[in-house]
Regions:
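Generic non-transmembrane alpha-helical segments
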Residues: 72-83, 182, 186-192, 265, ...
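Residue-level signal for inorganic ion chemistry
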Residues: 30, 66, 88, 111, ...
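ALDH superfamily catalytic-core signature
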Residues: 227-319
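Short, structured beta/alpha segment
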Residues: 1-90, 262
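Proline-centered turn/helix-capping motifs that create local helix->coil transitions or kinks
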Residues: 112, 116-125, 305-312
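Short linear capping/connector segments at secondary-structure termini
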Residues: 87-95, 125-130, 248, 314-319
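Rossmann-like NAD(P) dinucleotide-binding subdomain of oxidoreductase/dehydrogenase enzymes
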Residues: 123-263
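Long amphipathic alpha-helix in the N-terminal Rossmann-like dinucleotide-binding domain
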Residues: 49, 71-82, 96-121
Length: 319
């Protein structure tokens, strides 16, 4: 990855407006895997300007044209599959087997689903009363993604924007920028017009705030903490943007005494540990009927003790 200190704006890898940088660390060993540039208000302004300009033409493309681009995006994503998996192994410490089967594979699985959805989408529908329902692209979208499922979240935000004729600016988590920048290369190779997709790295207080407040961004999509989601909502309210949020929370499983305890507790504990316990829907709590509490405790302890921790570079089902 040669472009860690650059941003992808207007179809080109460009130098940032400022010289501020930060280290990207492998959390499994604290080794530095790269130095990434941090963006500023000026970088966001540059990205929004070209995204707004690109929207004028890209929003008028046909569904057939956008489907062809999505299919080419899938081809290039499959070609860069291992690069994406290895990037997430390093930047977030995901075991390589899981990085392939769950993390990188999400980029392809979600793409297949959105291709199917776009195929079925009727952009113009005549209602029973004679009215015409038109489905049109929203405009320029600001997309902010987290570090725990980097490509999964990028795919869930970027692909539907591209599929529906929107243009976008992506700010990935500053802790997992490498996979996002590889994905920018994928989009570039797939042949998307300049300015349709743009990437600016940076911290939320600077780049995220600039995006949420920008008058020419029509929609913000954010996945992350409740604290940051509140700020995105408040900042977006100044220009009455459409906002979608997926925020933090805890996800308890409820266990009653008539459940299959061996099966259900094993499933709960393993799901909690999946992705090293870093999934937003990890069942980190069990709400247990008192009559079976002691038995559940024994099963949970046994399953947890059997889970192994090892080097993410090694193949296997360890965490």
């Amino acid at each position: 990855m040669d472009n860690l200190k650059k941003f992808f704006i207007d179809g080109k890898w460009v130098e940032p407006a400022t010289s501020e940088t930060m280290k990207v660390l492998n959390p499994s060993n604290d080794e530095t895997i790269g130095i990434v540039a941090l963006g500023s208000d000026e970088d966001v302004n540059n990205a929004v300007k070209v995204a707004k300009r690109a929207f004028e033409t890209y929003s008028k493309t046909t569904k057939k044209d956008r489907l062809a681009l999505l299919k080419e995006l899938k081809f290039v994503t499959e070609k860069r599959f291992e690069d994406l998996a290895q990037a997430m192994r390093q930047e977030m410490g995901a075991p390589i087997s899981m990085a392939r089967s769950a993390q990188a594979d999400a980029a392809i699985g979600h793409l297949d689903s959105f291709i199917d959805a776009l195929n079925e989408l009727e952009e113009r529908t005549k209602l029973i009363n004679g009215d015409i329902l038109l489905k049109e692209p929203i405009g320029v979208c600001g997309l902010i993604t987290p570090w725990n499922w980097p490509i999964n979240q990028i795919a869930l935000k970027v692909i539907p924007a591209l599929a529906t004729g929107c243009t976008c600016i992506l700010k990935p988590s500053e802790h997992t920028p490498v996979s996002a920048m590889i994905y920018a290369e994928v989009i570039e190779e797939a042949g998307y017009p300049a300015g349709v997709f743009n990437l600016v790295n940076g911290v939320g207080d600077v780049v995220g705030t600039a995006m949420s407040k920008h008058k020419d961004i029509d929609m913000m999509s954010f996945t992350g903490s409740t604290r940051a989601g509140i700020l995105v909502t408040k900042d977006s309210a100044e220009t009455i943007k459409r906002v979608t949020l997926e925020l933090g929370g805890k996800s308890p499983n409820i266990v009653f005494s008539d459940a299959n305890l061996e099966r259900d507790i094993e499933y709960s504990v393993k799901e909690c540990m999946l992705n090293t316990g870093q999934s937003c829907d990890a069942p980190t709590r069990l709400l247990v009927e008192s009559s079976c509490y002691e038995e559940v405790l024994k099963i949970a302890k046994k399953v947890a003790e059997e889970i192994t921790i090892d080097d993410p570079e090694k193949e296997g089902d360890h965490i």
